[in-house]
Amino acid sequence: MKIEGTVVAMVTPFTEDDVVDEAGLRENINYLIENGVDGLLVAGTTGESATITHEEQRRMIDILVDEVNGRVRTVAGAGSNSSREAMGLVEYAEDAGADAALVITPYYNKPQPHGLIEHYTMLEEAADIPLIIYNVPSRTGTDIDVDTVAELAKLDGIIGIKEASPDLDKVSMLRSRLMDLGLDDFTVLSGNDNLTLPMISMGAEGVISVVANVDPARMSRLVNEALSGDFESAMKTHYELYSLMKVLFIESNPVPVKEALNMMGKARGSCEDAPGTPAGCKP
């Protein structure tokens, strides 16, 4: 199983009554597929995984798998700072038929490397669904190091990492270590739209993208150009998207991307339980 190319970190649309807009979610799924993306993720950071209920999370996984119907890869957000909760979500994603589960490093508790290895090993042993590690130290307070990732990459069920730290040298160190271990099949995905081009040049194989919610065709083009080795064209596409990459993060994600989708007439709704965040998020 490979998860690569442009995977969209989808927003969670809500109705005016602050319930998940299931019809809107299906509309967004089809819009993104029609514009050439390679995969879709629900209930990630952009999907407000930290504030939606587990019931909402499970329902979105069901809708994703049903609506996609094999057309692109499906990735279920299934992380938690509780190993038991994460296990339940991973098992649910497997039963629902998702292609992979994205599992964030446990947040707030700030586990040491041995704790991270224990956490992910337990999840890998609990279910047969491929797992993708999600490293986003700016949100979790934990930055999983290269040695720990390399150790986890030896497990058959852990197939890749979404790397959302800004440290580009870390990508080189990780790729070098994986090559030394003969683990070339382990996938590295960019977790930052603006760093996707340089990360692919260092051996990453795609991106889990926020920007692709708004401009899926052009973000897919950037990734495809870079993966094919056409870095001159990819650089031009990168700079065509650069202003969008920056403006979508002028407020806490997903506030700007939801407002952009609102301006486009796409389903977005308010943000769930996001105090102090304007531009369409409820207080």
UniProtKB/Swiss-Prot annotation:
GO terms for molecular function: 2-dehydro-3-deoxy-phosphogluconate aldolase activity; 4-hydroxy-tetrahydrodipicolinate synthase activity. One of its GO terms (biological process) is diaminopimelate biosynthetic process. It is an enzyme of class 4 (lyase). SMART domains: DHDPS. The active site is at residues 134, 162. Pyruvate binds at residues 46, 208. This is 4-hydroxy-tetrahydrodipicolinate synthase. The lineage of its organism: Archaea, Methanobacteriati, Methanobacteriota, Methanomada group, Methanobacteria.
